[in-house]
Amino acid sequence: MAASNQSEVNIGMVGHVDHGKTSLTRKLTGVWTDTHSEELKRGISIRLGYADCEIKKCETCDEPECYTVGKKCDSCGGKLQTLRKISFVDAPGHETLMATMLSGASLMDGAILVIAASEECPQPQTKEHLMALDALGVEKIIIVQNKIDLVSEEAAVENYNQIKEFTKGTVAENAPIIPVSAHHGANLDVLLKAIQDFIPTPERDETVSPKLYVARSFDVNKPGSEIKDLKGGVIGGSIIQGALKVGDELEIKPGIKVTEGNKTHWVPIITKIISLGVGSKKLKTAYPGGLIGVGTELDPNLTKSDALSGSLAGIPGTLPETLEKMEIEPQLLERVVGSQDELVIEPLKTNEVLMLNVGTSTTVGVTVSARPDRAEIKLKLPVCADKGDRVAISRKIGSRWRLIGYGIIL
């Protein structure tokens, strides 16, 4: 069970650019997840944003009015009982940032697919994001029909029918569709009830060896800090199994690239956990759920500017091997989604360059051999992954990487 300061479940906020993912996240959590200056300037999410909220229930009101994220009941002002804390992962909706969305999907226990009622459905990245959730095995999905305040009742019903038609035969075929206005905060109680009903906290085995997907890494020191005040590098990510404690030794793989003569190999990094935290709250032990900040003894130079994002961290000696080459069983989609002309997807070819997402890592690989049921791929950047893990596969089509399917590591 996650500590009380910690979220129990990670929910992805996905969908086409400008359909209101970040606005909805803000309404639910009070946090505007576009915090990087470039994001504020361009009005789009570039990196994964994270924000937590507590779902609460009024002890006297009926459903769904009893659900809120506020400090008191929205209907009667009465006392609230906290049901659980959840963490939202706000993924970029822009087509050029698909790799970031795919790396975020590996952290998601469920997802909210945001679709604007004011535009035709499906838009290109609505399709691509739904396929990505399917490819990476995210099955617990709620559809939010946002911006209903901008359309007439007839247009909202027509858009609802388009959503039903679009999701037919997909992983979201039976997903609830909740009409919402994130701008006005309308129907959020119904959405909170749906989150409680349709995205349960997964069963977690806390006795297994811990694994942490690293999604971000930072140097938290300000320029000009005194040497005595310097802090070690910080990594941020989600624990996917087991538990980490302050004082534990931590191994981070693939680690550092070392060149000796004309040979290059990767050396895992070993460090110690100095602190664990969620936002500004400190933890002694961290469990799966939410984004965890892990303070280490590492040289901050190793962690600055997300240098370790895409790594896997755990107790030394328990992590899978680092792969510079991988064999996968490909499962390709029939057509390319996300582009205007939905081309038929050809089988993988020998010497083809592919983009692969494994866990939170993004790498490029060249197929050494390719058959319909098996492909061997040499990776430009190695990844630390287990047999049986899913790999999202993207192919360069025109000037963009497009998701074409997934593979299982053999």
Swiss-Prot record:
Record field: catalytic activity: GTP + H2O = GDP + phosphate + H(+)
Coiled-coil ranges (or none): none
Domain of life the protein comes from: Archaea
Residues the entry annotates as binding Mg(2+) 2: 18, 43
Alphabetical keyword list: GTP-binding, Hydrolase, Initiation factor, Magnesium, Metal-binding, Nucleotide-binding, Protein biosynthesis, Zinc
Stretch list, region G2: 43-47
Positions bound to GTP: 18-23, 146-149, 181-183
EC number of this enzyme: 3.6.5.3
Family matches, as PANTHER family: EUKARYOTIC TRANSLATION INITIATION FACTOR 2 SUBUNIT 3 FAMILY MEMBER, EUKARYOTIC TRANSLATION INITIATION FACTOR 2 SUBUNIT 3-RELATED
Protein name: Translation initiation factor 2 subunit gamma
Species name: Methanococcus maripaludis (strain DSM 14266 / JCM 13030 / NBRC 101832 / S2 / LL)
Gene: eif2g
